[in-house]
Amino acid sequence: DVATVFLVDLSASTSSPAVPPEPVVVEASSDPFDDPMSYGPIWDAPRTVEPIRRVIDVAKDAVALMGDALQDLGDRYAVYGFSGTGRDHVEFKIGKDFADRANASSWASIAEMKPLRYTRMGPAIRHASAKLQAVGAQTKLLIVISDGYPQDVDYGADRNDRDYGMHDTARALADAERVGIGTFCVTIDPAGHDYLRDMCPDGRYLVIDDVESLPEELAKLYLGNVGGP
């Protein structure tokens, strides 16, 4: 009997492209006026603009795929998003709660989650932990998906100061573990090792180099923590 929370970072930085666009290289020797077609009316050559796939889009797709799989397994799960601007404005968004059915309405709620403000992680972990504690499951797992370290306007005298946010988050994770909730932090930040090894319980984090591999890595992480084929 398993209950899992997927806690998704909704900080403003998750609006960044999942894969940075390739730079356009123009040869210095090329002269556009050598080709009369190159300076014709621009509407003569319509072009298709591909929508930019953002970090938040990959995260939402990953938890939606996991939701489908857990639904088939009969495992309970919830999807929440978090952000904030100071201690008086903590944002905790419900994509799917434990009591919600997995249907078009819950998928739409997850799809509507969008990048907001800062990465105020500690309070979100505490709130998600309280929701997990209320679920009568033998195994409880909290998976935090982020793209950077905890950060907010009042996390220390300088908003770039990492210490307060890291200590607050580490305390929230330790408190969750203390009441029997398995925690795991997943980040797509290449520098994630620098702070996650101090912030998370031993071995309870994963740094992903390729954001597009997030769905596959989440599946491996889940099976590794709850058991499976």
Residue ranges, per PLM feature:
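Acidic, glycine-rich A-domain
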Residues: D1-P229
